[in-house]
A protein has these predicted regions:
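Beta-strand-loop-alpha-helix segment that lines the small-molecule cofactor/substrate pocket
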Residues: 103, 109, 115-150
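N-terminal glycine-/serine-/threonine-rich beta1-alpha1-beta2 phosphate-ribose binding loop
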Residues: 8, 14, 21-124
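Bacterial N-terminal signal peptides that target proteins for export
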Residues: 1-7
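Solvent-exposed, flexible loop/coil residues
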Residues: 5, 47, 138
Length: 150
């Protein structure tokens, strides 16, 4: 996971025009997976094994899917950890997250909302990392890549 995160943030640092490479403010969309706490720990905690310097998670949007138990049953717990342990600010919309960050990670466990989430991030012209799955369908994934290429 550390290598994939390092690669993602190396790419974000190279392409981000809004932030110095050592001060990237990251936002996370979809706080219903253990990946959000794992990524936040290695970005925000210098004492963490595998710490990746140069970026900090500073903002989040809960998201979640009401029809997937592994989503709705975990989102509040992961959100609380991000707030209490790492001081992450939770916003009520993806647009608010985008206004307060330099780059975004979409982490929602459910791939179905990824296209709608990515549309907002791409429209805000923020570098974007999408965790698996890229989209809910192959057509969604293709559309995400098409939008990102524009």
């Amino acid at each position: 996971m550390t290598r994939s995160l390092l690669l993602a943030f190396s790419a974000l640092a190279l392409f981000s025009l809004n932030a110095a490479a050592q001060n990237i403010r990251a936002g996370i969309i979809g706080l219903d997976t253990s990946h959000v706490t794992a990524f936040t720990e290695i970005l925000n905690d210098p004492s963490s094994k595998g710490h990746v310097p140069g970026a900090r998670v500073v903002a989040g949007f809960k998201g979640g899917s009401p029809d997937i138990e592994s989503s709705w049953s975990r989102v509040d717990g992961y959100t609380k950890t991000l707030q209490d342990k790492y001081g992450v600010t939770i916003y009520d919309s993806i647009e608010e997250v985008c206004r307060n960050v330099d780059a975004v990670l979409i982490e929602s466990v459910d791939g179905r909302p990824h296209l709608a989430q990515a549309r907002l991030v791409i429209a805000a012209r923020k570098p974007l990392y999408i965790d698996k799955p890229v989209g809910g369908t192959l057509a969604d994934a293709r559309e995400i890549f098409r939008l990102a290429a524009e």
